[in-house]
Amino acid sequence: MVVALSFPEADPAMSPPSAPELHQDEAQVVEELAANGKHSLSWESPQGPGCGLQNTGNSCYLNAALQCLTHTPPLADYMLSQEHSQTCCSPEGCKMCAMEAHVTQSLLHTHSGDVMKPSQNLTSAFHKRKQEDAHEFLMFTLETMHESCLQVHRQSEPTSEDSSPIHDIFGGWWRSQIKCHHCQGTSYSYDPFLDIPLDISSVQSVKQALQDTEKAEELCGENSYYCGRCRQKKPASKTLKLYSAPKVLMLVLKRFSGSMGKKLDRKVSYPEFLDLKPYLSQPTGGPLPYALYAVLVHEGATCHSGHYFCCVKAGHGKWYKMDDTKVTSCDVTSVLNENAYVLFYVQQNDLKKGSINMPEGRIHEVLDAKYQLKKSGEKKHNKSPCTEDAGEPCENREKRSSKETSLGEGKVLQEQDHQKAGQKQENTKLTPQEQNHEKGGQNLRNTEGELDRLSGAIVVYQPICTAN
């Protein structure tokens, strides 16, 4: 189960900025696309970078974050398809609709020098005209977009699971294995994530930091593990592995710490291409390749000062530095030498996606600046059901075999256990592994409390045979 946070709503009265005008030749292309009823977008096509963004006052952090999201291939594909706005019944203040308008304006108006102002529907609930942490804004934006999707899904199908395009694109699962040193019993818990914070305090590369997340952590003394089999705290070892890899991988280099956001300013190398297969709990088949497409950079002593910008890879394969209104070309060598804060990788299969179907007549609508204002007073009532297969019921925990339980079965088991116990997840204390990221990320290897009883985690026990 994915735990989504609640955030203050943006002011629905705020209207998004007007779009730049189309040139005559571009308008002709739009006419042809509308006639065909299909708008093609491929990251292999000569698609240039998005517009520069105005700095409205200490807003470089959100500009850099928005540029990284705008140039995320699977997210851009989904936004340009206009799928969400066609089923959204409450476009006023909807973060998905606001992001959809932002991405559409930015990517469909890419003449040199084009500049747009980020919609206040996207920024007003977070931005208070002072410098903030770009990573925090990223997570805030993704969670509010996720919640907007859930509202549409709940209205169309109240029994659907808490899944959304945001978690389909950015979401993955950790598998935590804990082995009791006393009875040798093993338990597994599965935790969702949208990004992976990396401890860089003692590493020189991102690969080393990823390897460190897999190192076994010894749970002993006051931090001993409560073993459900032994029914008391016992020494144990804990290891983390990726159970399910996301389409888009966000790696957060933990540069900031403490309430003042003091920065760890050290050079950490990162590759243009990354294979995640070695970090999977059940690696099968060939490599799992990822390609770097965006790098978010911070210059300064703390997260509350200095300057943010980013480098992004456009659809035609060229790199650009996006620094507020300035959009300048750069090469991959300079990109790999940046002092990165957040790295964005996309599975190469998703990088080479084909075209997007767009209904006939939608091209003019999304390019019309009045469309943005019209949406705020318009409610659409067509709904498309969103259902998920929850899987077949499983046997009770006492009858489980020693064979590892699947993730789908684990979800059902957890729901049955919660129903029997009458528990509510919001009343269960969360461990640091499940709590939202604080500044600079969290240490995923830090463990407190009884991990068998994690809220939001799916716990699967693997009993062992004992001699009489």
From Swiss-Prot:
It comes from the Eukaryota. It holds the Pfam family UCH. Its EC number is 3.4.19.12. It is an enzyme of class 3 (hydrolase). Deubiquitinating enzyme that removes conjugated ubiquitin from specific proteins to regulate different cellular processes. Changing residue 60 to S: Loss of deubiquitinating activity. InterPro entries: Papain-like_cys_pep_sf, Peptidase_C19, Peptidase_C19_UCH, USP_CS, USP_dom. The active site is at residues 60, 307. Ubiquitinated. Residues 1-20, 374-449 are annotated as: Disordered. GO terms for biological process: protein deubiquitination; proteolysis. CDD domains: Peptidase_C19E. The gene is Usp17lb. Induction: Up-regulated by interleukin-3 (IL-3) in the B-lymphocyte cell line Ba/F3. May also be up-regulated in response to JAK2. Belongs to the peptidase C19 family. USP17 subfamily. Inhibited by ubiquitin aldehyde. SUPFAM superfamilies: Cysteine proteinases. Residues 51-348 form the USP domain. This is Ubiquitin carboxyl-terminal hydrolase 17-like protein B. Keywords: Hydrolase, Protease, Thiol protease, Ubl conjugation, Ubl conjugation pathway. It catalyses: Thiol-dependent hydrolysis of ester, thioester, amide, peptide and isopeptide bonds formed by the C-terminal Gly of ubiquitin (a 76-residue protein attached to proteins as an intracellular targeting signal).
